[in-house]
Structure formats: structure tokens, C-alpha cells
Amino acid sequence: IGFTGTPLLSSDNITARTFGGYISVYDFKRAVEDGATVPLYYENRGEKILDLHNPEITDRILDAIENADIDVDQQDKLEAEFAKEIHLMTAEPRLRSIAKDFVGHYSDLWTSGKAMFVCLNKVTCVRMYNFVQEYWKEEIKALKAKIKTATQQEAQELERKLKWMQETEMAVVISQEQNEIQTFKKWDLDIKYHRTKMEKRELDKEFKDSSNPLRVVFVCAMWLTGFDVKCLSCLYLDKPLKAHTLMQ
């Protein structure tokens, strides 16, 4: 018999004080060795993107951001309290740099699997989707030009990649909130297109299907926990996550 629970109170080890220490531990290393899970690799892409300036994320900001999607009022309070940090994290030049790097990185891994991109908030999800779409089209255009000058063998592989990029679909997956149309209009964004897609299609099933062309999703809170996707190979984080929120 095994008992498990999510350690929510990291600063106050109340479970250990109440029930005592662990009887046994089945850690991540053993799970990988047993084949129960796959290895996890972390790469700091931020250090490789030129002119990418990340604001200092303190524990206080981290706690606030982690709970930012509970309700609209709390999110408004967060954005007012940490306006400078959030402004830096969501500035267009920064988001564009990340979007361009994402397109280059993920398109190079086109034979691996699907990708999930975690953004700071809902508006940023849609903005990042738009930026990625722009650079994705540019990459397709560059790929077509490259095929023209490639050898026959190189061209065959590049054409396979081109077909994959042209077939790849992306989606924004965020929860609905009151007055969201007006909220997104302030940023000159149309949420109706994305909301219709979320309501009329079973995006969760499509994303879990390795043969389905829905290969990239942009999220900020949904699908981060309790959502298993065996064909997911890359998780791109541009939102501070920690503890159970990160590992689940």
C-alpha cells in the first residue's frame, strides 16, 4: 500500500511533524531507472538569447505569480503590485526574442514530439501565439529557399521538415473569465477565435494524440497539473513555477 500527497506547505513541514519522517522514498532517479518515467533535461535558453533581460524574480513575486490565475481581482492586484517586473516580462521585444528562439529550437526538434509553452498570463498566451505564428511562417519561407539550393538527399529531408511545419497546428488553451473580450481588446487582440476553437473542439484529446497535427499549445495555468501527454517532449517555461506546480 502506498500513500501519497502534494506537499503544499513547503515552508512549514507539517506532514513530517504530524506523522513522522518518510518510511521509504521512491524518487525520480529510481523511477527513471525502472522505466516508470522518462529522463528530464533542463536547458536555460534565456542565457542563449541575445539582449534578453529577465527581471529578478524574488520568492515574494514567485508566490504571487504562482497564484495569479485564481481570479481576476487577484491578477489585477498582482499586476499593480509588481507592475515593473510584469512590464519587463511581457515587453514586446522580449516576447519576440523568445518566440523567435522557440521557432528555431522546436523546429530543429521536429522529429521528437509535441510542445507546451507556458506563459505568464492569458493575454501573453495570445500575444506569444501571434509572435510564434509570425516567425513560424518566416521559417517556412526560409526553408523553401534552402530546399532550392540543397542537394537531392538534403532536399528530401528538408521537404519532410517543411511538410511537418506546414501541417503543424497551434492553439491557445486558457480558462474563460468575465469581460474577456474587452480585456483582450485593450491589447488589440481577438480572443473570440481562440475561444471558439476551445469550445468547439476537443483540444485535450487532439493534443494527446501523437498523430494529430495539433503539436503546440500555449497555456498559463490550464493543463499544467494532472494532464498526462505521452507524446509531449518539450515544455517551454516563461512563467516562474515551483514545487508541485512545476513537477506535476
Predicted features by range, described:
Residues 23, 34-40, 112-113, 165-169, ...:
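Short glycine-/polar-rich loops that comprise or flank the Walker A/P-loop
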Residues 79-216:
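Conserved C-terminal RecA-like helicase domain
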Residues 215-219, 223-242, 246-247:
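A short beta-strand element within the Helicase C-terminal
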Residues 6-10, 33, 46-50, 122-124, ...:
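Conserved nucleotide-binding/hydrolysis micro-motifs of P-loop NTPases
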Residues 12, 126-131, 228-231, 246-247:
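A short acidic (Asp/Glu
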Residues 12-114, 128-134, 140-150:
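Interdomain helical connector at the RecA1-RecA2 junction of SF1/SF2 helicase-like NTPases
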Residues 1-12, 35, 117:
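Conserved helicase ATPase motor motifs in RecA-like P-loop NTPase domains
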